[in-house]
Amino acid sequence: MDLETRLVFIDTSAYEVKKLQFGHFTLLRLQELIDAEKIHLLITDVVRSEIEKHLKKYAEEAVTAHRNFRKQGSFLCVAQEVAGDGLFPDITPEAVLNEAMRKFHALVDNGLTETVSIENVNPKQIFDDYFSGAAPFHRNAKKHEFPDAFSLAAVDAVAKSRHQSVYIVSNDGDMAAVADANASFIHLKSIDTLLDLVNRNDKELAELSTFADRVLEQLRPEIIQLARKILSNAEFIPYTTGDADPEISDVDILSVSIDELQLIDVTSDDATYDVTFNVELAASYDFQDYSHANWDKEDRVYYGVKHCSESFRHQEQYTAALQIGFMEGLRTNAEVHSLSFDDGLFDLNLDNAEYIE
C-alpha cells in the first residue's frame, strides 16, 4: 500500500489500545517518526483532554492495584534476592501521573505535533448529523459520539483547507464509518498499521524493510515454536457473559500461526514487529452450579452445589512485540531477540468456544 499523505489524526481509542504508554514501545516509535517529520500528527483539544483524563484514571487504578499487591504479596520481602527490590516501592498516583503527563506532553508539545481546536466547528452541522442519524451517530449510545464528531469535523476542516487527505487512525467502528463516507479521510485500524505503512514507504528504509521481511520468513518456524512455548506455560483467564464461574483445570495448545505482521521499526541490524497470532487450544473447566443449591444460615455454607467438568475448543488471537536481529545485515546472523506478548494473562472467551463432547 502506498503512503498517500503524512497528515495523521489518531483517535483516543487507538492510543488506549497501546495502554497510553507514551514514550515506550510503539508510541516511542511514533514519536521518533514525528520528530523525523515522517508524520505530521494532528491532535484535537478534545482528544488531548480525553487522554489527560484517562491518564489520571490509569495512574490511580495502577497505584491502587500495586498497593493491593504489596499487601497480598508482602511475604515476598523475605526473598528479595529472587523477587527483586522493585516490587515494593512507595509510589503515589500524583507521581505516576506527573511522569505519564510529562511523556505525553513530549509527544504533543514538541513543536511539530499540531493541536487543532474545535472552537470553529459549527454546532449546527453536528446536531444535523445527530438528528439525521449520520455517522458517527448511526448506532446506539449516540450521545457518546459528540466528542468524536467535533474532533472529526475540526480535522476535516484542516484537511480541506490544505487540499490534503488525512489518515484517521481508530479502532472505533463509528469513526471508521465517518472516514469511509468522507473523501478527505483514509481510515487505518491501528497505530501499528500506520507505522508499518510509513516504514515501508520510506526510501531510506524500503530495502531494509524488504530484507527484514525475508529474515522474518526464515525465522517463522522458530517464532511460532517460541510463541507456542510461551503460551504453553501461560496463565489463562476465562470470561463469559453468563452466570458460570469456571476454573481452568487444563489447557492444551493445539496450533499457533501468524495472522498479521506490522513492521514497527527497522535498522541495519534488527527489526521490530507487532505480531498477531491465531491460537487454537482446548481447555478443560471445572464448573460449580448454584442454581439448585440451598444456603444454610447456621453453617454458612451452600448445600446441593453441583460440580461438573467440561472441555471447550477456543479460537483466540493474541498480540506480541517481536524483535529479530541480523547483525551486519547478514541473513546468516538471523536470530530472534525477543517475543513479548502484550498481556501476561491470556483471556479465553467461553461465549465463542466450541463444546467438546
Segments the model singles out, each with a brief description of its role:
Residues 2-164, 173-226, 230-273, 278-280, ...:
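Active-site-proximal, substrate-binding regions of enzyme catalytic domains
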Residues 168:
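Conserved SAM-binding loop
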